[in-house]
């Protein structure tokens, strides 16, 4: 393998590890908040279930697509959104404050309220299992 290829591979590996560590840290925090038994099945259901909020049908997949390894697009602004799955976007979930900020904002828009620690853990459990 050539040197640039090896450097790229090492960088991607370190980003994957950072993402996994970020998810593990977030899940530990949700457990500290009383959540337990995270479920990928519940996470997927939360991701794909549409709800009517303020007269509009909304789901996580409205902006992020049903396939979290694919890029999305904001339904109102058209702004591109990087893939949610860490396998497709290794920097995803490495910044805990940023992750919490987006959970707060997106849960309020999608669910009409903030997500519970259990819901966040379920979503992260499902998202962390999605592979390219």
Task: Label every model-predicted segment.
Residues 1-7:
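Bacterial N-terminal signal peptides that target proteins for export
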Residues 8-16:
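Bacterial N-terminal signal peptides
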Residues 21-54:
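Electrostatic cytochrome c docking/interface patches
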Residues 38, 94, 98-102:
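Generic alpha-helical secondary structure signal
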Residues 55-67, 123:
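The canonical Cys-X-X-Cys-His
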Residues 72-79:
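Short cysteine/histidine-rich zinc-coordinating motifs and their immediately flanking basic loops
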Residues 81-97:
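Short microdomains enriched in Cys/His and/or Lys/Arg
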Residues 100-132:
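C-terminal capping alpha-helices of c-type cytochrome domains
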